[in-house]
Amino acid sequence: MKVYLAAPMRGDRSALANVKKLLQALEERGYVVLTKHVADDVLDVEKGMTPREVFERDIRLLEEADVLVAEVSYPSLGVGFEIAYFLLRGKPVIALALRERLESVSAMIRGITWENFRLVAYSDVDEAIEKLDSMLPGSVDMQ
């Protein structure tokens, strides 16, 4: 199964350590993570990619992915776009937010009631991974 892991890239990257652990956990479980670059310390634009190249690459990867896992504890226009794009294609989205930041997550994201969307609060990354294990497609909770 192919996972699109989404996380803030240009804004507040306070959850980066959690994103790195999520990436590692997904790969250890045999998932193909298409967006390993979200855990990089150096941004794509700093590596010389243009915004258009980033957009085109990410759209291609969104089309290829089976499920989107998004870290939404900190605001990101890009992550919001990726969630909407995926939802409108009827694909499953799991959004993860630190419990202490849940009220800061966009009301637009917190208000989604579609069947293919889950917003999951977590206290630490181990709890997030445990919840992901039970929610990824193929498990009872996402069907």
Curated annotation (Swiss-Prot):
Disulfide bonds: none annotated. GO terms for biological process: deoxyribonucleoside monophosphate catabolic process; nucleoside metabolic process; nucleotide metabolic process. Its EC number is 3.2.2.-. GO terms for molecular function: 5-hydroxymethyl-dUMP N-hydrolase activity. Gene3D superfamilies: 3.40.50.450. Monomer and homodimer. This is Putative 2'-deoxynucleoside 5'-phosphate N-hydrolase 1. The lineage of its organism: Archaea, Thermoproteota, Thermoprotei, Thermofilales, Thermofilaceae.
